[in-house]
Amino acid sequence: MSRKSSTEYVHNQEDADIEVFESEYRTYRESEAAENRDGLHNGDEENWKVNSSKQKFGVTKNELSDVLYDSIPAYEESTVTLKEYYDHSIKNNLTAKSAGSYLVSLFPIIKWFPHYNFTWGYADLVAGITVGCVLVPQSMSYAQIASLSPEYGLYSSFIGAFIYSLFATSKDVCIGPVAVMSLQTAKVIAEVLKKYPEDQTEVTAPIIATTLCLLCGIVATGLGILRLGFLVELISLNAVAGFMTGSAFNIIWGQIPALMGYNSLVNTREATYKVVINTLKHLPNTKLDAVFGLIPLVILYVWKWWCGTFGITLADRYYRNQPKVANRLKSFYFYAQAMRNAVVIVVFTAISWSITRNKSSKDRPISILGTVPSGLNEVGVMKIPDGLLSNMSSEIPASIIVLVLEHIAISKSFGRINDYKVVPDQELIAIGVTNLIGTFFHSYPATGSFSRSALKAKCNVRTPFSGVFTGGCVLLALYCLTDAFFFIPKATLSAVIIHAVSDLLTSYKTTWTFWKTNPLDCISFIVTVFITVFSSIENGIYFAMCWSCAMLLLKQAFPAGKFLGRVEVAEVLNPTVQEDIDAVISSNELPNELNKQVKSTVEVLPAPEYKFSVKWVPFDHGYSRELNINTTVRPPPPGVIVYRLGDSFTYVNCSRHYDIIFDRIKEETRRGQLITLRKKSDRPWNDPGEWKMPDSLKSLFKFKRHSATTNSDLPISNGSSNGETYEKPLLKVVCLDFSQVAQVDSTAVQSLVDLRKAVNRYADRQVEFHFAGIISPWIKRSLLSVKFGTTNEEYSDDSIIAGHSSFHVAKVLKDDVDYTDEDSRISTSYSNYETLCAATGTNLPFFHIDIPDFSKWDV
């Protein structure tokens, strides 16, 4: 549609009877829509196009457009300022109210605890005790992985359960010792002890573990208070799954020597593949401990299968008509499954007591846990030995990553499953404060456990307060059951560890899902697992981080920019699909009543309505699947280049965009001033023209060249198969679609300036640069600062858009009409609109809310 420039927009038809034209225009549109519907049903493709020369009711469509749209009031769009940004994004966060809200958010318990009731309390009590019965044996087992005494696992368990309930935003997560963090703690202890003489006693494993807990707590708390939880999102899910799987594989093979009774012969701190080799090599050294390891392991798996799968299937099969009995039986199986670790340990501890009591350590036939101090004997402020922090510094990053990633991944997962919001920043504060306070009880790093959290969720826990009951169970065990802990077989604890950690192994289904979703994710997962197994857990973690960051960088550096073509489409409202219903579903297979309903539904559909528009889609739509692959995409008018940037326009990718756009311009258009040098040797090396075979080679190979004379000074484009060439058009318009650009920077804007200079020099004229779909006011500000978007004498004077300036208009509605109501909105006629206004600034003729239809322009 031809429009005048913004300086020439005036009301030229003030005396026209607007109401008459509005009525005529509505009648015309209704008649046109009816003709289009008839044309589509008759298969006449020409009816898709609007016949602008046809007159209806004494006025043409173009005349109506002139009356209704050509005259719009000027709208001077201003650039965004720092004050506006402050008022919009910062000001509301610096008030006393926001400060109070921030302080309250640090203690989520304030919001929900006043509503606590008996129903919640009962559910939390059941869940807390159930998880506590699992946590006690697991915590002692995981302390064994961390090369610590069992009591340190109990210390970490009870303090984690108590403190986390005050700061948590997840009701399901259970804080305490976990397998992967215990393995990382053991690695840190081993690496630090290597730096000290063997005979020193000042720096011990418990001191190193507690110091690690302190440092992890400080960092996690700081990240949470500063609201830097978004940094956790930089590591992808497949990367986390990779090092978790590798770590689980490491733990399982590290526990097999203890399971078989020859753990003193295998160094489980080596690389996993070496542990596997040495474990298999020493199988002949198996002792009686294998009985207390293999049998409990088999029992645990059979118990889990029976109570979790087979028993429930039997209940559904034999009590199908008795749902209450079936539900009670399922509840019994559920709690029986939850208690399997505790029951197995109790049974085999009793057997161990019967064969090891009143015997010295040398005479005992199996290895047992030994003395576990009763109560909280280690409470107090710890003293950090000199030089310990510097010796631990290299181990801190990997430890913090394991601590934070595992917890955030678990909490967000259960938040999605159980429909509540988890705040990552607050969760960082929760685990940070938990570990900070844990240092006073000489605990080692604790974080969220997946298996215990899943159990807690299945117990229908209602609030985080259930952690208090869980901590109470652990505290009760510390004071009352330590004498019984003395006789727990170490092989049985290893069986419990293997059984629990095996759930961390990623299944083949998840791996296949990674492959189907994104093959690169699957590759990173597999490589991370191999690095963790054949090198170390730290290297696996660092590779996972580097891979995630590299993928982000590569996606930015190699943008998915697309050159666009146009296609005319129509949105069909209430279409009548022309297909045989029987081909989809046989009406003979439907009941008569339902069959009548289906037929009646098809018959009462309203008449289709069409909304025509021009859409810009990539030329490779067959690959991108943005459009039906059978649709033909027409190129822009000659001399017009339309390019869509697929991501943010920054210093990382601006050079690549520059090259892609300028190469396409040289391919599709010709120079504005032809090179007419007499000698071919005088042409520039980067534009030598068409290559001609020397006469000697022609005679040698009897090469027959086409005799048609061509101008060698013209750039050669894609010709037809018979060797003919054509003269390419001059470049007139470059349109950049910024609808997917979230931000720009100074380097990228400067590359646009350089592109404009190069293009103007190549075309030997001022070329129009149009921008569509800009979604940020700061992008507009950046472009305007270098004289894009508006007319100026240097790059784009008024003459280059004379006769074809384009603006989108919007309809301003009256205040007395409820446009949120569907019926009111449909029944509202054009006369209910108050006026028309420019959708974008009339002072910015090169900025558009959508890509203009350049085929209507007189360029």
UniProtKB/Swiss-Prot annotation:
InterPro entries: S04_transporter_CS, SLC26A/SulP_dom, SLC26A/SulP_fam, STAS_dom, STAS_dom_sf. Keywords: Glycoprotein, Membrane, Transmembrane, Transmembrane helix, Transport. GO terms for biological process: chloride transmembrane transport; sulfate transmembrane transport; transmembrane transport. The lineage of its organism: Eukaryota, Fungi, Dikarya, Ascomycota, Saccharomycotina. This is Sulfate permease 1. Its main location: membrane. Disulfide bonds: none annotated. High affinity uptake of sulfate into the cell. It comes from Saccharomyces cerevisiae (strain ATCC 204508 / S288c). Residues 630-808 form the STAS domain. It is a multi-pass membrane protein. Glycans are attached at N51, N93, N358, N391, N630, N653, N718. GO terms for molecular function: secondary active sulfate transmembrane transporter activity; sulfate transmembrane transporter activity. The chain crosses the membrane at residues 94-114, 116-136, 148-168, 173-193, 206-226, 234-254, 292-312, 332-352, 395-415, 428-448, 468-488, 525-545. It is found in: Membrane. Gene3D superfamilies: STAS domain. Belongs to the SLC26A/SulP transporter (TC 2.A.53) family. GO terms for cellular component: plasma membrane. It comes from the Eukaryota.
